[in-house]
Amino acid sequence: MEQSEDGDLDAGDELFEEVDGDGKGEIFANRELLNIDHVPDENRIVGRDEHITELANEIGPAVTGSPPNSVILYGKTGSGKSLVANHVMERARREAQRRDRRLATVTVDCAQSRGEADTVQTIADKINRSTSGVTVPTRGISTNEYYNRLWQILGTEYDAALITLDEVDRLSDDDILMILSRAREAGKVDVPIGIISISNKVNFREQMTERVKSSLGHNEMIFDPYDGEQLRQILENRKDAFQEDILMPGVIPKTAALAAQRHGDARKAIRLLRHAGDYAKTNNIGTVKESHLELAQEQAEVERLKELISGLPPHSKYVLYALANLTDGTTNSNDWFRTTVIYDVYEEVCKTEATDTLTTDTIRGLLNELAFLEITESNQEHGGMGKGTYKEHRLLWDPNVVFKMNPGSAQVDTDR
């Protein structure tokens, strides 16, 4: 390698000596194993063999170009729904390729692509090939045109398609479910399409219109939370993310126990273990200990909350900051607050963010969405004779976790 004027490039830059591009270092051997989106090999998946087989049976016809069934996967966060869907989809793609069939497989995070046009654009863009002759711009065309381009891509490039809509309950409109599932029947495209809908809400089907229910059929799978032993095994199967002898013996059992307290959330367990490793690395500690889990827990919660609200508009976050300020500032056991009280503090948050406020009705809608995501809880209250009804809201997260998402600008003075 050539030497620059600043010295020998082979020596590297000490500013970046702690950065391990391959996830390796003194603590980690393969940090990728602790990424939430990582899909492990089949022998690392715990307690979901029956789900894998059942889902494969439902969508299996797609590998031959025949019509697959659409399926709805229900379960709490971290119960393995996305993991199983991605695992089975990838195996289906490989099997179709082996059989010389062109199978489109695509996953859309509906928390990020919430509108119908955004979702269709994302699907079309992800499965598009250079040979299709079709372009899929991010904006500038109608929703109908996005559908037309999707049909063109499917018709020229594929024999079948499997579309996973993760967090499908976050979609602003469920029309897309009916349009996709009935596309072949309606003569839009001569390609069978199967939809895997993933929801954290067990009552999601009840929220669908009758037309959508009819289109999707009745194929449903329930994912129960992992128990403590399953969580321990999940972590054991990923402990080679660390260098040998880095994890102290009690770390994995304690991580599993902490995650089991929150409805068996495997995502939380994996996050906790990763953050504990990051803490040890950042502080130049040679091992990961049980005590590091307590320090890592809040950071894992911050990351989870960021994930939950990532697709929400900015003012949803301002409303959340307002409720966190009220909760943090309360001097009694009453942590329920009326919409009007939250709105007053929301106005203060908007001042710190140098932005205009939205209407009270709009804020009511944003509060309803936060409750839907189980970030807050809402109750309808009666004011008494002649005073009508009103809503009160309560934060379900530690206010400090909310503040740490946006240090410095999230806290305001709630004294009046």
From Swiss-Prot:
Similarity annotation: Belongs to the CDC6/cdc18 family.
Functional summary from the UniProt entry: Involved in regulation of DNA replication.
Lineage, top ranks: Archaea, Methanobacteriati, Methanobacteriota, Stenosarchaea group, Halobacteria
InterPro entries for this protein: AAA_16, Cdc6_C, Cdc6_lid, ORC1/CDC6, Orc1/Cdc6_arc, P-loop_NTPase, WH-like_DNA-bd_sf, WH_DNA-bd_sf
The keyword ATP-binding is assigned to this record: yes
GO MF terms, alphabetically ordered: ATP binding
This protein's UniProt keywords: ATP-binding, DNA replication, Nucleotide-binding
GO BP, sorted A to Z: DNA replication
Keyword ATP-binding: yes
Name of this chain's protein: ORC1-type DNA replication protein 9
SS bond partners: none
Residues reported in the UniProt entry to bind ATP: 79-83, 226, 238
One family name in Pfam for this protein: AAA_16
Species, as recorded: Haloarcula marismortui (strain ATCC 43049 / DSM 3752 / JCM 8966 / VKM B-1809)
SMART domains: Cdc6_C
